[in-house]
């Protein structure tokens, strides 16, 4: 789905360029630009469980880590006039990528800082990740060699993981870390998904010197709606959580060189973070068909870093 979206965005300028001459001023030179990039995605996703009846202390945390997943990224920007532009962008992983997951529990309220149970799952995969972004920019400062804009937009991002096999250390029958073992290699243990809906505001700008151009962007949101789905296959249990008004921060920097007046090659780095916040969670136990709901019983966090190299072409 996301790959198709990128293809549509990148093909749009070709369609526009074939319109009648009467619209040539509106779609003329320096009015539409497209970008296509290849790169990698690395990051970590965290899910937490809290116990409201024990003062909201943390009783469980799962850390999902991945590195260098191949991604395809694209964008199209349309300058409606010299001071206003709209854009669409997105990226998607090209295939799954190996990772690692660590699951820790703190079940003894008398020693809340010491974990009692831990499992490690080196056979973990990032199944997919993707994002789309729609935005509008107002260029309040625009000179021949630099410009600056405020922007507002909406983006959504999704992540999916599976953990298979692994080893464990449990505290059983009143003992402390007294039971160890390994799960069969082919047993799917946990599946996890995150979904974020992010309205944001920010700043963006660039500076050009001869054929070199440098740019950056900053995004902020305090209105993120996050949700996740945690499937414990062995226990036949599903956890679903929702968090509202999370904080989101993103910083992007890029540097490029114009090989022709219309074409620029460039590299870019983007760091993004969704900070942890408590939300409501629901548990569904399929072994006995029971369920329960807890307010402020879950926490969701995500951060990642994207590096890409690509081409920008202006029509």
Swiss-Prot record:
It is found in: Cell outer membrane. InterPro entries: OM_adhesin/peptidase_omptin, OMP_A26_sf, Peptidase_A26_CS, Peptidase_A26_omptin. GO terms for cellular component: cell outer membrane. Pfam families: Omptin. Disulfide bonds: none annotated. Its EC number is 3.4.23.-. Keywords: Aspartyl protease, Cell outer membrane, Hydrolase, Membrane, Plasmid, Protease, Signal, Transmembrane, Transmembrane beta strand. The keyword Cell wall biogenesis/degradation does not apply. SUPFAM superfamilies: OMPT-like (SSF69917). GO terms for molecular function: aspartic-type endopeptidase activity. It is a multi-pass membrane protein. Residues 1-23 form the signal peptide. It is an enzyme of class 3 (hydrolase). PROSITE patterns: OMPTIN_1 (PS00834), OMPTIN_2 (PS00835). Belongs to the peptidase A26 family. Protease; also acts as a receptor for bacteriophage Ox2. This is Outer membrane protease OmpP. It comes from Escherichia coli (strain K12).
């Amino acid at each position: 789905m996301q790959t198709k979206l990128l293809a549509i965005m990148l093909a749009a300028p070709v369609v526009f360029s074939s319109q009648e001459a009467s619209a040539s001023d509106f779609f003329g030179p320096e009015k539409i630009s497209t970008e296509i990039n290849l790169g990698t995605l690395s990051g970590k996703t965290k899910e937490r469980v809290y116990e409201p009846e024990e003062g909201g202390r943390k009783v469980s945390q799962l850390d999902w880590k991945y590195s260098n997943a191949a991604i395809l990224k694209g964008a199209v920007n349309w300058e409606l006039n010299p001071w206003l532009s709209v854009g669409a962008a997105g990226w998607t992983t090209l295939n799954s990528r190996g990772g690692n997951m660590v699951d820790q529990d703190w079940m003894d309220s008398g020693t809340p800082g010491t974990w009692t149970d831990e499992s490690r799952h080196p056979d973990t995969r990032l199944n997919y990740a993707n994002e789309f972004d729609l935005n509008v920019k107002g260029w309040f400062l625009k000179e021949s060699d630099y410009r600056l804009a405020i922007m507002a937009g909406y983006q959504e991002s999704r992540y999916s993981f599976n953990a298979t096999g692994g080893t464990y250390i449990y505290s059983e029958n009143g003992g402390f870390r007294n039971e160890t073992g390994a799960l069969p290699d082919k047993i799917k243990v946990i599946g996890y998904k995150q979904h974020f809906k992010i309205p944001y505001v920010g700043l963006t700008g660039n500076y050009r010197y001869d054929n070199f151009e440098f740019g950056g962007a900053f995004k902020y949101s305090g209105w993120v709606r996050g949700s996740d789905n945690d499937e414990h296959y062995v226990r036949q249990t599903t956890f679903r959580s929702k968090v509202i008004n999370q904080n989101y921060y993103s910083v992007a920097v890029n540097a490029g060189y114009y090989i022709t007046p219309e074409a620029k090659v460039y590299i870019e780095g983007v760091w993004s973070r969704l900070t942890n916040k408590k939300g409501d969670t629901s548990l569904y136990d399929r072994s006995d068909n029971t369920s329960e709901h807890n307010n402020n019983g879950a926490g969701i966090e995500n951060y990642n870093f994207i590096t890409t190299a690509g081409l920008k072409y202006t029509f």
